[in-house]
């Protein structure tokens, strides 16, 4: 499913969640942070990104369509938290203690750094790599970094260096 045409009902649900969490944050923080710009232009395997300087949230329309409920519940507050942390604290670690606090204490959402959505429809070419416990699929970018000797990747489970299959 490569379409970026989103049903209006899904766009409205995204906006409701954004407004709800922004109002909640403004109330708890005693601030009046503005509504960020929202676009559906994120591509690839990222569910969303927060652009600090332009105060914008970019969401992946394909992943949103395929995972609407979980996406709206998790990704929208996740990206909003990045913008609120930037407004409230300035430049800090992207998923540091300030972001975790904003997610859990202010927005009331579990602080997860990554999504668990199925990526088959948005994944492009991948390259098989192995460790001692499983097979991994590296993106073209990561594969090229390995080939050029710029990066080494390790399995998060066993810690072994990944090798091309």
From Swiss-Prot:
Listed InterPro entries: SprT-like_domain (IPR006640), SprT_Zn_ribbon (IPR035240), Uncharacterised_SprT (IPR023483)
Biological processes per GO annotation: response to stress
Domain spans labelled SprT-like: 22-163
Active site: 79
Gene3D superfamilies xrefs: Metalloproteases ('zincins'), catalytic domain (3.30.2010.10)
Keywords of this entry: Cytoplasm, Metal-binding, Zinc
A GO term for molecular function: zinc ion binding
Cofactor(s) needed for function: Zn(2+)
GO cellular component annotations of the record: cytoplasm
Signal peptide: none
Record text on cofactor binding: Binds 1 zinc ion.
Cell compartment(s), UniProt: Cytoplasm
UniProt: Zn(2+) binding residues: 78, 82
Alphabetical list of SMART domains matching this protein: SprT
Recorded family membership: Belongs to the SprT family.
NCBIfam families according to UniProt: PRK04860.1
HAMAP family: SprT
Record-given protein name: Protein SprT
UniProt organism field: Escherichia fergusonii (strain ATCC 35469 / DSM 13698 / CCUG 18766 / IAM 14443 / JCM 21226 / LMG 7866 / NBRC 102419 / NCTC 12128 / CDC 0568-73)
Taxonomic placement: Bacteria, Pseudomonadati, Pseudomonadota, Gammaproteobacteria, Enterobacterales
Gene designation per UniProt: sprT
